[in-house]
Amino acid sequence: MRRHNQIKNHNKTNELTKAFVEEILKFNKAHNIVGRFTEKEINLLDVLDCESILPYTNSAKKILDIGSGAGLPGLIIAIHQPQTEVTMSEKNKKKAYFIKRTIHTLKLTNANILDEAVTPKLITANKFDIVTARALASTSKIIKMSKHLLSKEGKFLLMKGAIEKINEEVAQLENNTYSYTIHKTKNTETNRHILEITQK
């Protein structure tokens, strides 16, 4: 019975992911919300890349995805982890509308959209176990704009590219305040990493 449920859940996840990609392609024709134009490109460069964060998010109850764009990685996390409440912030109204529409289309009850920028002045109803961002800004800038939204034991999981650039960015962090771990992603052959940052 347990294996049957696992297969059922896996099939549902695959169906939702496929439907999400179809929504991107459909919306992208008129509004250009991502720089990919084929299902293969989106699956390889976006979906697989975003799925690489999942081993590090599955114990979180509340996640904030800053500058979510087309819902990457926020909607991928919400699809794979129905037990996790995922909030996506996106100040671009067109992209925020796409996320809101996709949440409704896919019937994702654990996902919601915050259609404004995350700033040090932003107040939310809850603190978050994880703050994540993908291709948004420098590490120090992301921390500055969102550290007040992290729970006491919370952490940043930032999706980054080349290791050289990451090393440059972490060198600017306060050593007595933050500790970090760099994880090489396994889902793609591209030079991608996940930067995990916690407060000491």
Where are these regions (language model features)?
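Class I SAM-dependent transferase core
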Residues: M1-A60, K94-A111
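Residue-level signal for inorganic ion chemistry
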Residues: I24, I77, K160, I197
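Conserved hydrophobic residues forming the short capping helix/wall of the S-adenosyl-L-methionine
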Residues: N28, I103, L150, V170-E174
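Conserved SAM/SAH cofactor-binding pocket of Class I
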Residues: L48-A133
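Active-site capping/gating segments
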Residues: T87, A162-K200
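Short alpha-helix immediately C-terminal to the canonical SAM-binding loop
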Residues: K95-Y97, T139, I166-N167
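A short glycine-rich, Lys/Arg-flanked "PGG" loop and its adjoining helix->strand segment in the class I
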Residues: I143-E153
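Conserved beta-strand signature within the Rossmann-like core of class I S-adenosyl-L-methionine
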Residues: E153-E164
